[in-house]
Design a protein with these regions (language model features):
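Proteins that catalyze or organize thiol-disulfide redox chemistry
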Residues: 1-52, 59-106
């Protein structure tokens, strides 16, 4: 299941999560973000139960993007125990994306 993270649920769904969380910081107008959409959805299904995977629209949730210094998108931040532990930016293959997630959550 792909989550939608907002200022209203970020604390509960991401920072207080008992499992790792991958947040895809994106914008609707961003073409590389659109390219990564299906990859993120696939990873949400593949990592179900092991990690939460979801999106955070930077235009609608600027305070979150600013807090984590998101300046380029798509940006992917993996949180463990409420802290960012890995950040990577830009479009990539599903294989590379999966490897980065696996390395960060294991």
């Amino acid at each position: 299941m792909e989550y939608k993270f907002t200022v209203d649920n970020f604390e509960a769904e991401v920072l207080q999560s008992e499992i790792p969380v991958l947040v895809d910081f994106y914008a609707d107008w961003c073409n590389p973000c659109k390219m990564m959409g299906p990859v993120v959805a696939k990873m949400a299904a593949e990592f179900e139960g092991r990690a939460k995977v979801g999106k955070c629209n930077v235009d609608d949730n600027m305070t979150i993007a600013q807090k984590y210094r998101i300046s380029s998108i798509p940006a992917f931040v993996i949180f463990k125990n409420g802290e960012p532990v890995e950040t990577f930016v830009g479009a990539m293959s599903a294989t590379d994306f999966k490897k980065k997630i696996e390395q960060a959550i294991n």
